[in-house]
């Protein structure tokens, strides 16, 4: 399994491949995206792509993880935030998804492709866990048990 690159040029190449994959999702759909198409769109050879990703699903997993991480970074982790801050966060979340290469298609892909659903679900579990930990630490709702708070956060 290829590791994440550390050098600037390698990081830029990996990002270029992810951007190309996102753009192709919007152009041709997840079924028709191939590693050869992504390599061509990114202006690299297929062996270069395979230096960074084992296969199509490793590439699409990384693409989904990149978007999930960026979205999660926008979520205010202070459970005491007022509604205006939360509403702005949601609008920023939507805008980030729109501006990301293939963003809306990445979200659809994470729901439609069984091999990729875990990317979205693990991201949600991680973020839910962080929100619950902060809420419990602040005693947002004294006396409420952890399982109940996790369910409410997950459904929100």
Where are these regions (language model features)?
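Short secondary-structure transition hinges
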Residues: 99-129
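Alpha-helical DNA-contacting segments of helix-turn-helix folds
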Residues: 60-67, 120-123
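An amphipathic alpha-helix signature
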Residues: 18, 87, 91, 125-136
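Amphipathic alpha-helical interaction segments
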Residues: 16, 58, 85-92, 151-155
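Hydrophobic alpha-helical connector segments
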Residues: 62, 75-100
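N-terminal intrinsically disordered/low-complexity leader segments
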Residues: 1-12, 143-146
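Hydrophobic alpha-helical segments that form the core
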Residues: 92, 96-97, 128-129, 143-156
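Helix-turn-helix
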Residues: 12, 16, 20, 24-58
């Amino acid at each position: 399994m290829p590791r994440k690159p550390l050098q600037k040029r390698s990081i830029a190449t990996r990002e270029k491949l992810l951007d190309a994959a996102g753009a192709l999702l919007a152009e041709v759909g997840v079924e028709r995206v191939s590693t050869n198409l992504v390599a061509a769109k990114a202006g690299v050879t297929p062996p270069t792509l395979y230096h960074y990703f084992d296969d199509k699903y490793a590439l699409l997993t990384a693409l989904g993880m990149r978007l999930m991480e960026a979205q999660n970074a926008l979520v205010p982790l202070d459970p005491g935030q007022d509604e205006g801050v939360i509403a702005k966060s949601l609008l920023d979340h939507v805008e980030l998804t729109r501006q990301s290469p293939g963003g809306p298609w990445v979200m659809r892909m994470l729901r439609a492709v069984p091999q990729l659903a875990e990317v979205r679900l693990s991201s949600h579990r991680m973020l839910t866990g962080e929100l619950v930990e902060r809420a419990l630490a602040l005693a947002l709702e004294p006396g409420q048990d952890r399982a109940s708070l996790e369910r409410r956060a997950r459904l929100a």
